[in-house]
């Protein structure tokens, strides 16, 4: 059938996968930092490495499953600007999660895919959605995290986040009653990241992972 998912179904799908992949991303970060601290004990380092690779495989499998769903079914069937942006953002997110664990040529490839999906989503969002729309704001939030964390481009990250925040502030009167809470929450997260990034002196990043949207 040609039926698109409803908003609620779309959100449930997104949250379900976000929880599954989120657990792996957290584990991967923890085990990677443990691995770095075990230099000097070959046995411990090997155990950490084996476990990291196991988590990596699970994380990659989940991401590829989501990306297949998006490319084969969800994106081709999306008819509204809202659903197109939602799914393209999701595609950018899952390639970004792959980029977090990938290395070498593979990393370059997934970074390009992530950036392309975010850019495509951003073009549609800017032309067809209010700056206060939670999906447009969530996209700006995650795209700016991509610039900061994956491309190591803090200036671009801050510019994108600030622009999205300022554009939303300028049109606060367009805030939809139904999505008021979502929109203002994401605006707060954009501000939090800007504060974090403009004060970041390159200390211990683990404690200061930026905020993301589902």
Curated annotation (Swiss-Prot):
UniProt-listed Pfam families: 14-3-3
Gene3D superfamilies reported in the protein's UniProt record: 14-3-3 domain (1.20.190.20)
Organism superkingdom: Eukaryota
InterPro entries recorded: 14-3-3 (IPR000308), 14-3-3_CS (IPR023409), 14-3-3_dom_sf (IPR036815), 14-3-3_domain (IPR023410)
Family membership: Belongs to the 14-3-3 family.
Name of the protein: 14-3-3 protein homolog 2
């Amino acid at each position: 059938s040609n039926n698109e998912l409803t908003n609620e179904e779309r959100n449930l799908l997104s949250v379900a996968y976000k929880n599954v992949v989120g657990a792996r991303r957290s584990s991967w970060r923890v085990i990677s930092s443990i691995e770095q601290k075990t230099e000097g004990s070959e046995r411990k380092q090997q155990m950490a490495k084996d476990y990291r690779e196991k988590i990596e495989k699970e994380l990659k499998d989940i991401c590829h499953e989501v990306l297949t769903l998006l490319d084969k079914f969800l994106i081709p069937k999306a008819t509204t600007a809202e659903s197109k942006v939602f799914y393209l953002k999701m595609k950018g997110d899952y390639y970004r999660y792959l980029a977090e664990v990938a290395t070498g040529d593979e990393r370059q490839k997934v970074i390009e895919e992530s950036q392309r999906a975010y850019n495509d989503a951003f073009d549609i969002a800017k032309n067809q959605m209010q700056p206060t729309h939670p999906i447009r704001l969530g996209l700006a939030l995650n795209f700016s995290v991509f610039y900061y964390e994956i491309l190591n481009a803090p200036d671009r990250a801050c510019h994108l986040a600030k622009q999205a925040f300022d554009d939303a502030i300028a049109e606060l009167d367009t805030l939809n009653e139904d999505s008021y809470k979502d929109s203002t929450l994401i605006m707060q997260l954009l501000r939090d990241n800007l504060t974090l990034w403009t004060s970041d002196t390159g200390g211990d990043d683990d404690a200061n992972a930026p905020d993301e949207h589902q």
